[in-house]
From Swiss-Prot:
Pathway: Membrane lipid metabolism; glycerophospholipid metabolism. PANTHER family: HEPTAPRENYLGLYCERYL PHOSPHATE SYNTHASE, PTHR40029. This is Heptaprenylglyceryl phosphate synthase. Keywords: Lipid biosynthesis, Lipid metabolism, Magnesium, Metal-binding, Phospholipid biosynthesis, Phospholipid metabolism, Transferase. Its EC number is 2.5.1.n9. One of its GO terms (molecular function) is magnesium ion binding. Homodimer.
Length: 229
């Protein structure tokens, strides 16, 4: 079984976006710790299966980050289930999780399921709109959500999601300081090796997503920047 505590870097791929097979191969063989498949727009069973089947040709762990119940398909190494702690809508905190367990609980291995305590901070990102996240929050609120994730809910992952914008690095450092057992994932604005290395000093795992589609070669360099620290 894969241990996220040992990870430092993941690529997040959107099944609704096109990526040439040659680039996908380079990502999968880059040394990244996992390929996470997920997104906010038009995530369907068909496009999830299509991308998973391509990633499955390689040895890298393949993870589905579940955003819709309809996109849950067998064949992934792990299933990340986001619980958006700062969502105004209960469905995104526990409601959809209940529905997923109701429909698929008997079919899924619980060892393959990893719950992420999400805190979405960028007010302009699609994930914030989709989940109705309260992004008008202070530093103290983010730290409180981190403590909720670890100490009250005992979640293995706390995911600080800036999705397209770069966080204040002091925010990441402060968040890491209040976590002991929960693994800190950071995503948002990581577009080159220098930024990845800088944020990788504080976050346990750096997530690189948009950069794959915007500047592939720079995105690829983030692996070595984080993994050799």
């Amino acid at each position: 079984m894969y241990d996220v505590n040992e990870w430092k870097h993941v690529f997040k791929l959107d099944p609704n976006k096109d990526l040439p097979d040659e680039q996908l191969e380079r990502l999968c063989e880059s040394g990244t710790d996992a390929i996470v498949i997920g997104g906010s727009d038009n995530i369907t069973e068909d496009n999830v299966l299509r991308l998973m089947s391509k990633v499955r040709r390689f040895l890298v762990p393949c993870v589905l980050e579940v955003s819709t119940i309809d996109s849950i398909v067998p064949g992934f190494d792990l299933y990340f289930i986001p619980s958006v702690l700062n969502s105004k809508k209960a469905d995104w905190i526990v409601g959809m999780h209940h529905q997923a367990m109701k429909e698929y609980g008997e079919l899924m291995s619980m060892e393959e399921i990893v719950t992420e305590g999400y805190c979405i901070v960028n007010p302009d990102c699609k994930a914030a709109a989709l989940t109705e996240a309260d992004t008008h929050i202070e530093t103290e609120d983010i730290l409180a959500y981190a403590r909720v994730a670890e100490h009250l809910l005992h979640l293995p992952i706390f995911y600080l999601e800036y999705s397209g914008m770069l966080a204040d690095i002091e925010m990441v450092e402060k968040t890491k300081a209040v976590l002991d057992k929960s693994v800190l994932f950071y995503g948002g604005g990581i577009k080159d090796a220098e930024t990845a290395e800088r944020f990788g000093r504080h976050a346990d795992v750096i997530v690189v997503g948009n950069a794959v589609y915007e500047d592939f070669d720079q995105a690829l360099k983030t692996v070595a920047a984080v993994k050799t620290k």
